[in-house]
Every structure is written in C-alpha cells, then in structure tokens.
Amino acid sequence: MKNLRNIKKVPFEIGQLLANNKRFCSFLVDDTNNPGDVSMSFIELLNEKYITIYPPVEDGAIEQHNRNTYAIILLDSISTADSDANIGVSGNIYITTDVNHILLTENRNRLLEMADEVLQTLDNAKLTSAGEIHINHISHTMITTFRAGYRISFTLSDQQIERAEI
C-alpha cells in the first residue's frame, strides 16, 4: 500500500546527514575566508535557520537577514503512479549565499565546495525513511540580484523495501 508517512520524513533525514558533515556546516556557519570545521546538531541548524525545509522568503528576502549562507531542502514532486509499492519522489537542495561571500581565499568558490560536500554526503546514501537518494544534477541559479546559489536535484529509489521509521 502506498503511504506518504515515511516520505514526509525525507527532508529531515537529508538535513541530519548534512548536519553530520562538519565541512558543510562550516560553510553555513562561518563566513570567513578559511572556515574551520564546525559541529552543530541538525536541530540547532534548523532553529538558527541555516537549514530549512521550506522556502524562508518573505517579499523576496530571507527572513533572517544576518544569514549569509543557508540551505533549503524541498520535495518538489511526489508521484503515486510509479508502481503499486513505490512512490516516485524528486526534490531539490538549494544552497545560497550573498555575492560578497561567494569567493574564499585563492578564488575558491564557497558554493561549489558546498555543492561538492552535498554530493559526497548524499549521492547513493541509504535513507532509513525512504530508500536511496540519487543526485541527478547540479545547476547554478541566481536567487536575487544579490544572492547566488546552486540547485542540487535528487530522486529517491527503492522506497518499497524500506520500513524503518525515524
């Protein structure tokens, strides 16, 4: 039987996996040129709005103006037509920063390094809530005139064999 009970947990599990990556957290929290490893829990990152599971916008601007860099995890499409047991799920992770914080020392691109951390952390990772996550592509996007970002598109597979709950 098809059930969205586990699917709705996916953004939280993705956020938890990203929170476990100290390098990824350092790019979110530390806007200096050479951020050191930062360790924060997923709940702390959610509470401080470094990671969100819904678009944190109000009139085109992020609610927390002091957040230079943040990540948004969204499930964009849920299709129940794929099979009897499997629910087709795709989504995006947006990572964004303001134009003043894109480059690090030696012209390293903060957002590309963050995208690489997402790719290394999530591609082919097994989620206890809903199968396996696959990163399909990464594309650049301008969020506003002053904010640049990357959209990291993913799909889930093999949900029907997963029964664990978070």
Regions found by a protein language model. Give the residues of each.
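Hydrophobic residues positioned within well-ordered beta-strands of beta-sheet architectures
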Residues: 71, 89-93, 150-152
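Generic short beta-strand segments
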Residues: 75-78, 96, 156-159
